[in-house]
């Protein structure tokens, strides 16, 4: 039965402890370009860079400058892991569970990730980026595509997410959802997930299997 299961992982705030860094980056860009939007960084959670540029930086020169800034920013990032995330992915693999990264990040950003952690290319059975989809979270397209690539039905998949759009995408894909309280407080996401965890340090394979019995 385990071999018909899959774990689908968002990247920032789930695998990597980087969400706070992106919040600071976009907060600064918001102060410079959109001081009239106080919650600028919050509005961008789960959205692709293409969408952000189209809506908030539509002028070509402005968009080009933002792309340059974020590329420089990501080149300097260390991409630290959320506690226990890499180990938990390994446990799923050992038990025959298919695993995928499902991220709103693009291929360009992933090149910076692979530069530091080339093993991620082979650790995950599929990697879905913003360049593979037409509609970003909260649309379920990315998670449904991941399930299809892994040869799994939605009911056989568990989504691990931290952002409101990502949690909603998992729900709309009709998958089990585990919320990580890394970006938002536990009480803010409790009603949007089947289980909420602070990180993966105490989340076991038995906990993972138990999710499938939740109605």
Question: Model-derived features: where do they sit?
Answer:
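Conserved phosphate-coupling serine/threonine residues in phosphotransfer and NTP-handling enzymes
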Residues: 14, 103-105
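N-terminal helical cap/lid subdomain that shapes the substrate entry/recognition surface
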Residues: 2-95
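Non-catalytic, surface-exposed connector residues within folded enzymatic/regulatory domains
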Residues: 43, 64, 82, 104, ...
């Amino acid at each position: 039965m385990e071999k018909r299961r899959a774990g689908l992982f968002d990247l920032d705030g789930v695998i990597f402890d980087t969400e706070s860094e992106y919040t600071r980056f976009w907060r600064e860009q918001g102060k410079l370009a959109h001081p009239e939007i106080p919650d600028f960084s919050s509005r961008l959670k789960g959205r692709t860079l293409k969408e952000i540029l189209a809506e908030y930086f539509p002028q070509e020169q402005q968009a080009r400058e933002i792309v340059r800034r974020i590329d420089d920013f990501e080149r300097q990032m260390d991409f630290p892991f959320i506690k226990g995330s890499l180990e938990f992915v390994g446990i799923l693999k050992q038990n025959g569970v298919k695993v995928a990264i499902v991220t709103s990040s693009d291929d360009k950003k992933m090149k910076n990730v692979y530069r530091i952690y080339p093993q991620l290319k082979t650790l995950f059975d599929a990697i879905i980026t913003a360049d593979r989809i037409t509609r970003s979270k909260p649309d379920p397209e990315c998670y449904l595509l991941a399930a299809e690539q892994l040869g799994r039905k939605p009911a056989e998949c568990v989504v691990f997410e931290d952002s409101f759009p990502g949690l909603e995408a998992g729900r709309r894909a009709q998958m089990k959802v585990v919320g990580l309280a890394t970006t938002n407080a536990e009480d803010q996401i409790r009603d949007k997930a089947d289980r909420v965890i602070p990180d993966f340090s105490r989340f076991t394979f038995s906990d993972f299997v138990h999710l499938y019995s939740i109605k």
